[in-house]
Design a protein with these regions (language model features):
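Conserved beta-strand hairpin/beta-sheet module of binuclear metal-dependent hydrolase folds
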Residues: 1-48, 154-169
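Active-site HxH/HxHxD metal-binding segment of metal-dependent hydrolases
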Residues: 22, 40-135
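Short, basic/glycine-rich phosphate-binding loops at helix/coil junctions
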Residues: 25-27, 108-111, 168-171, 213-214
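Divalent metal-coordination and catalytic microenvironments
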Residues: 28, 37, 61, 81, ...
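Active-site neighborhood of phospho(di)ester-bond hydrolases with catalytic His/Asp-centered motifs
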Residues: 35-39, 54-65, 78-81, 143-148, ...
Length: 298
């Protein structure tokens, strides 16, 4: 049986696992009820669907570990950020944004999403943007855009309770993740700085059972440091010339042993490529043919 915790108007259903393919699900209740990211665990969500009157379903972004049990709540007003909405309307769009479109991984990835995760395209999508408010009757949410992990990643603030939902800006030691084609390291950095300015007594992440209370500044610092630490590892690896695929094979970011047949190899490659772009722009590395190398001064 999964663990739950009530904080003010928010009930947290902690994910069956603290990582993919599950996430924390939130139920926010005023006179109306909002369900957030139904992906904690199937039995709990089937029970929730049978026992609760859900008025709104909100997905923080389009990743499978946040949408896997959406079909249990078909017919409910569906909300997501405008910038991620195309991925809910079209599986092909999602494949393109993830980066599998036109690759050997595409069909297997699509099969996994539709069969294992039950993905269905949604034609009726109510789009929110940064600052959009939702009045549940006695409880008001302010949606907050945290782009980077995906273009439309969105959490929210409940001002009267000083509760901040971080979504997948989850501040874990393993993050952040920018493994999709449409992800952006710089946008993640900017989102961290945005979060730093938000006044909240309680901050809830999408993964793990730790609820953050009070100042999360030091956690934000460590989260950013992970990005810069990865960059240093890449620079160290480029003491001798290496191609993008050779760097991806080292698993410098994920730490997983990956074969090129695994889609996670593509995701590792995507993340490494984003760092290489940053390092090239910063003139810390050079490129000759397909090989990259650290500049002599670095």
């Amino acid at each position: 049986m999964i663990q739950t915790q009530q904080i003010g108007p928010v009930k947290i259903f902690f994910g069956k696992l603290p990582y993919y393919p599950y996430c924390n699900t939130l139920l926010v209740k005023g006179r109306q009820t909002l369900l957030v990211d139904p992906a904690c665990e199937e039995k709990a969500l089937r029970r929730l669907a049978a026992e609760e009157k859900i008025d709104f379903l909100f997905n923080t972004h389009y990743h499978p570990d946040h949408i896997r049990y959406n079909p249990l709540f078909d017919g409910i007003d569906f909300l997501t950020h405008r910038d991620d909405a195309p991925c809910f309307r079209s599986l092909d769009s999602m494949a393109e944004w993830v980066g599998v479109k036109g690759t050997p991984y595409e069909q297997t990835w699509k099969d996994t999403l539709t069969k294992a995760f039950g993905f269905r395209e949604k034609k009726e999508v109510k789009e929110v943007t940064d600052g959009t408010t939702l009045d549940l009757g006695g409880v008001t949410l302010q949606f907050l855009h945290f782009p980077g992990h995906t273009p439309g990643l969105t959490g929210f603030l409940i001002p009267e309770f000083e509760i901040l939902f971080l979504a997948d800006m989850e501040l874990s030691p393993a993050g952040p993740w920018y493994h999709n084609k449409k992800a952006s390291i710089q946008s993640i950095i900017d989102s961290v700085e945005k979060i730093r300015k938000i006044r909240a007594a309680i901050s809830i992440p999408s993964h793990g059972q730790e609820i953050f209370r009070g100042d999360i500044g030091p956690r934000l610092d460590r989260y950013l440091e992970n990005i810069y630490s990865r960059e240093r590892k890449i620079l160290e690896a480029l003491s001798t010339p290496k191609t993008l695929d050779e760097l991806a094979s080292l698993s410098l970011i994920s730490g997983f042993r990956l074969s090129r047949e695994q889609v996670w190899f593509l995701f590792e490659r995507n993340m490494i490529e984003k760092h290489l772009d940053r390092l090239l722009r910063g003139e810390k590395i050079s490129k000759k043919g397909e090989a990259f190398q650290r500049r002599a001064t670095e």
